[in-house]
Amino acid sequence: MANAASGMAVHDDCKLRFLELKAKRTHRFIVYKIEEKQKQVIVEKVGEPILTYEDFAASLPADECRYAIYDFDFVTAENCQKSKIFFIAWCPDVAKVRSKMIYASSKDRFKRELDGIQVELQATDPTEMDLDVLKSRVN
Protein backbone atom coordinates (compact mmCIF):
# COMPACT_ATOMS: atom_id res chain seq x y z
CA MET A 1 0.00 0.00 0.00
CA ALA A 2 1.63 3.24 -1.10
CA ASN A 3 1.79 6.27 1.12
CA ALA A 4 -0.18 9.15 -0.38
CA ALA A 5 2.34 11.71 0.88
CA SER A 6 5.43 10.17 -0.71
CA GLY A 7 4.17 7.17 -2.68
CA MET A 8 6.35 4.77 -0.65
CA ALA A 9 5.11 1.27 0.12
CA VAL A 10 6.39 -0.78 3.05
CA HIS A 11 7.83 -4.19 2.14
CA ASP A 12 6.36 -7.05 4.22
CA ASP A 13 9.86 -8.01 5.38
CA CYS A 14 10.04 -4.69 7.28
CA LYS A 15 7.14 -5.70 9.51
CA LEU A 16 8.29 -9.32 9.81
CA ARG A 17 11.78 -8.36 11.03
CA PHE A 18 10.27 -5.85 13.47
CA LEU A 19 7.98 -8.52 14.93
CA GLU A 20 10.97 -10.84 15.32
CA LEU A 21 12.84 -8.13 17.21
CA LYS A 22 9.85 -7.24 19.38
CA ALA A 23 8.50 -10.70 20.21
CA LYS A 24 11.44 -13.06 19.90
CA ARG A 25 14.34 -10.63 20.45
CA THR A 26 16.23 -12.29 17.61
CA HIS A 27 17.71 -8.94 16.49
CA ARG A 28 19.42 -6.06 18.30
CA PHE A 29 18.65 -3.58 15.53
CA ILE A 30 17.15 -3.16 12.08
CA VAL A 31 18.18 -0.54 9.52
CA TYR A 32 15.60 0.37 6.88
CA LYS A 33 16.23 2.09 3.57
CA ILE A 34 13.89 3.71 1.05
CA GLU A 35 14.41 2.25 -2.41
CA GLU A 36 13.29 5.17 -4.52
CA LYS A 37 13.14 3.25 -7.82
CA GLN A 38 10.94 0.55 -6.29
CA LYS A 39 9.02 3.16 -4.26
CA GLN A 40 9.20 1.14 -1.06
CA VAL A 41 10.88 0.88 2.31
CA ILE A 42 13.07 -2.23 2.60
CA VAL A 43 15.25 -3.89 5.25
CA GLU A 44 18.88 -2.95 4.62
CA LYS A 45 20.58 -4.58 7.60
CA VAL A 46 19.67 -6.68 10.62
CA GLY A 47 21.95 -6.81 13.66
CA GLU A 48 22.46 -9.92 15.79
CA PRO A 49 21.51 -9.69 19.50
CA ILE A 50 25.19 -9.82 20.53
CA LEU A 51 26.06 -6.64 18.61
CA THR A 52 26.68 -3.41 20.52
CA TYR A 53 25.24 0.06 20.16
CA GLU A 54 28.53 1.09 18.53
CA ASP A 55 28.00 -1.62 15.89
CA PHE A 56 24.52 -0.24 15.28
CA ALA A 57 25.68 3.39 15.00
CA ALA A 58 28.47 2.34 12.61
CA SER A 59 25.90 0.67 10.33
CA LEU A 60 24.21 4.02 9.58
CA PRO A 61 25.73 5.80 6.56
CA ALA A 62 27.33 9.18 7.31
CA ASP A 63 25.77 10.87 4.28
CA GLU A 64 22.42 9.12 3.68
CA CYS A 65 19.08 9.02 5.52
CA ARG A 66 17.77 5.83 7.11
CA TYR A 67 15.10 4.64 9.52
CA ALA A 68 16.25 2.33 12.28
CA ILE A 69 14.88 0.29 15.15
CA TYR A 70 17.09 -0.36 18.17
CA ASP A 71 16.24 -2.67 21.06
CA PHE A 72 17.84 -0.86 24.01
CA ASP A 73 18.51 -2.87 27.17
CA PHE A 74 19.08 -0.93 30.39
CA VAL A 75 18.96 -1.23 34.16
CA THR A 76 16.59 1.06 36.10
CA ALA A 77 17.46 2.96 39.28
CA GLU A 78 15.64 0.14 41.13
CA ASN A 79 18.08 -2.34 39.54
CA CYS A 80 15.49 -3.88 37.18
CA GLN A 81 16.55 -5.10 33.73
CA LYS A 82 14.34 -3.46 31.07
CA SER A 83 14.19 -2.92 27.35
CA LYS A 84 12.74 -0.16 25.15
CA ILE A 85 12.27 -0.22 21.39
CA PHE A 86 13.58 2.97 19.78
CA PHE A 87 12.62 4.28 16.36
CA ILE A 88 15.43 6.45 15.04
CA ALA A 89 14.98 8.72 12.06
CA TRP A 90 18.57 9.24 10.88
CA CYS A 91 18.85 12.20 8.53
CA PRO A 92 22.39 13.62 8.46
CA ASP A 93 22.86 17.28 7.53
CA VAL A 94 24.99 16.28 4.53
CA ALA A 95 22.30 14.03 3.00
CA LYS A 96 20.71 15.16 -0.26
CA VAL A 97 17.73 17.47 0.16
CA ARG A 98 15.48 15.20 -1.93
CA SER A 99 16.35 12.24 0.29
CA LYS A 100 15.61 14.23 3.45
CA MET A 101 12.22 15.24 2.04
CA ILE A 102 11.28 11.67 1.06
CA TYR A 103 12.28 10.25 4.46
CA ALA A 104 10.47 13.05 6.32
CA SER A 105 7.24 12.64 4.32
CA SER A 106 7.23 8.83 4.68
CA LYS A 107 8.17 8.58 8.37
CA ASP A 108 4.76 8.72 10.08
CA ARG A 109 3.18 6.17 7.75
CA PHE A 110 6.14 3.84 8.14
CA LYS A 111 6.06 4.12 11.94
CA ARG A 112 2.37 3.21 11.96
CA GLU A 113 3.27 -0.09 10.26
CA LEU A 114 5.53 -1.01 13.20
CA ASP A 115 3.30 -1.51 16.21
CA GLY A 116 5.28 -1.43 19.45
CA ILE A 117 7.68 1.48 19.08
CA GLN A 118 8.18 2.99 22.54
CA VAL A 119 10.54 5.93 21.97
CA GLU A 120 11.17 8.06 18.89
CA LEU A 121 14.40 9.88 18.22
CA GLN A 122 15.40 12.12 15.32
CA ALA A 123 19.07 12.63 14.64
CA THR A 124 21.02 14.69 12.12
CA ASP A 125 24.38 14.04 13.74
CA PRO A 126 25.82 11.08 15.73
CA THR A 127 25.88 13.11 18.98
CA GLU A 128 22.07 13.40 18.83
CA MET A 129 21.72 9.63 19.17
CA ASP A 130 24.62 8.55 21.35
CA LEU A 131 24.11 6.18 24.28
CA ASP A 132 23.68 9.02 26.79
CA VAL A 133 20.79 10.39 24.73
CA LEU A 134 19.10 6.96 24.70
CA LYS A 135 19.62 6.58 28.45
CA SER A 136 18.06 10.01 29.07
CA ARG A 137 15.00 9.12 26.96
CA VAL A 138 14.11 5.92 28.84
CA ASN A 139 13.65 7.60 32.23
From Swiss-Prot:
Keywords: Actin-binding, Cytoplasm, Cytoskeleton, Phosphoprotein, Plant defense. One of its GO terms (molecular function) is actin binding. It comes from the Eukaryota. GO terms for biological process: actin filament depolymerization; defense response to bacterium; innate immune response-activating signaling pathway. The keyword Cytoplasm applies. Phosphorylation at Ser-6 is required for resistance to Pseudomonas syringae pv tomato AvrPphB. Induction: By the root-knot nematode Meloidogyne incognita. Residues 5-139 form the ADF-H domain. The keyword Heme does not apply. One of its GO terms (cellular component) is plastid. The modification Phosphoserine is found at S6. InterPro entries: ADF-H (IPR002108), ADF-H/Gelsolin-like_dom_sf (IPR029006), ADF/Cofilin (IPR017904). It is found in: Cytoplasm, Cytoskeleton. Pfam families: Cofilin_ADF (PF00241). Disruption phenotype: Increased root length under light-grown conditions. Increased length of hypocotyls under dark-grown conditions. Altered architecture of the actin cytoskeleton in hypocotyl cells. Compromised resistance in response to Pseudomonas syringae pv tomato expressing AvrPphB. Belongs to the actin-binding proteins ADF family. PANTHER family: COFILIN-RELATED. This is Actin-depolymerizing factor 4. It comes from Arabidopsis thaliana. The lineage of its organism: Eukaryota, Viridiplantae, Streptophyta, Embryophyta, Tracheophyta.
